[in-house]
C-alpha cells in the first residue's frame, strides 16, 4: 500500500518566484541559497555551505551517508546581469506573472530548474522515504568563472567521502517544447589568443616594415576553413571560429607593430584540448615562418568534450519525460558548456530541464505549466530510480 502524504506539496512555481526575487547576479549569493538551505533543512536534509573563493555553494543530502544508492541533482542560482533594465517590460527581479508566463532574470536559467528539483526531492522524501540518499549540489558560480562553484562542491565531496551514483543537471535543455531534448554530453571548448608581431613603419615604405595584418588574415583563414572532422555518432563536426581581430591603429598611413586575434573552438570526442593546442601552435608557427612575423599564443580550456553513452540513466529520464509530457526527448550534445563537464568526472550525468531559448535575454520568462511539468518529471525519475 502506498504511503499517504502528510505534508502539503512544495509549490515549484512559488519557489521559483521566491528565488527570482533574490538578486543573485554572479557572483552574488543574493539570499537564494539561504532560502533553499532553510527550506531543505526543514524537510530533513543535512545542509552544508561549501563556500570557496568568495563564492557561496550549498550541499544538501537526505539519507545516511553510505546507506544505499545516491541520486544527485546539480544546478545554480547565480544569474547573468540584466542588461538595460529599462528595456524590460517587467522588473527583472519581480517574478511578475502575465498569463502562463513568469518574468525575471533566472526564470529560465535556471532558478525554475532548481525550484523544480528541490520541490520534487522534498515531496519524495516526505511521502516515500527511499532506502538511499538524495543529494542537491547547488552553486552560485556557474555564470561566472566556474572555478569555485560545482568544482568546489565536488572537491569537498571527495575530501569528506560524500558521493552520488548518478546525477541530473537541471539546465534548460529543450529548444522548442518542454520535453523535446536531453543532453547526454557536451562539446569541449577551447579559446586561443594570438599576438602577431611585425615591425611598425610608414605605409609608403613597405620594404622597411613587417606588416602583421596579412599574417593574421592568413592564420585566421587557415584555422577557420580547416575541416577538423566530420562529426561522430553523437556529436556534430568540430568548429573553429574567429571571434575578434584587434589592431588599435587609428592612423591610416602607419603599419602597426602588432595585432591580436582570438579564436574559439567547439570540439567533439575525436579531440582533446592538448591535441588542438598542438595543432594551433603548428599552424601559428607555419604562418610566422612564411610571413616573417613572430606569433605568440596562449590558450584557455573551458572543458573537454564528454559523453554519457545512452543507457540506464538516459532511459530512466527519457521514460519519465515521455510519461509526463508525452514527448520522447532527443539525445543531444549540442550547445555550450555546463557544469555537467565537472560532474562527469564523479558519476554518470545527463542534463534535462526547461525550454531555454529565452535565457539571458531581456524579458527572460518561463512558462508556469512547464515548471509544474518539470517537477513531475523529476519526481517520477526519483520514484523509478529507487524502485529499481
Swiss-Prot record:
Catalyzes the hydrolysis of N-succinyl-L,L-diaminopimelic acid (SDAP), forming succinate and LL-2,6-diaminopimelate (DAP), an intermediate involved in the bacterial biosynthesis of lysine and meso-diaminopimelic acid, an essential component of bacterial cell walls. Its EC number is 3.5.1.18. It catalyses: N-succinyl-(2S,6S)-2,6-diaminopimelate + H2O = (2S,6S)-2,6-diaminopimelate + succinate. InterPro entries: ArgE/DapE_CS, Bact_exopeptidase_dim_dom, DapE_proteobac, Peptidase_M20, Peptidase_M20_dimer, Peptidase_M20A. Belongs to the peptidase M20A family. DapE subfamily. This is Succinyl-diaminopimelate desuccinylase. It holds the Pfam family Peptidase_M20. Binds 2 Zn(2+) or Co(2+) ions per subunit. Keywords: Amino-acid biosynthesis, Cobalt, Diaminopimelate biosynthesis, Hydrolase, Lysine biosynthesis, Metal-binding, Zinc. HAMAP family: DapE. The keyword Nucleotide-binding does not apply. It comes from the Bacteria. GO terms for molecular function: acetylornithine deacetylase activity; cobalt ion binding; succinyl-diaminopimelate desuccinylase activity; zinc ion binding.
